[in-house]
């Protein structure tokens, strides 16, 4: 008998995002996967802020991507400049119904349709200091591992069927 359900309905969705934001995120994650990048949604940073999507390249470059689904969403959110301290590149991501000219020119920009995305504008690089890189990379790894554990618990799968190293080094 289950005494406590720690996973809720779906361990991978926290329920704060609108359907439109989830659509943008899905398309963006498909593109990032094609770019051989891995991503963690809603990554809690040491400042206490949550990055909509954090991405890590095979070479260790860290990106923060803020998802904006309307003009109002962009207008009321003024916390995004703080994210520069936690990434090598800062991007926005949106969909076709949001005018692209509202986004700052000194940030990258993605356009997503839920089935994929493309880079409208690349983000300028502002490399993290080594200590900052280590802290954000560790937060990324811990969040990813924790969410994997919750997803496994929610599925009831013990993972006895596969090798513990399956998928590493690809």
PLM features: what roles do these ranges have?
Residues 51-64:
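Active-site beta-strand-loop-beta-strand hairpin of nuclease catalytic cores
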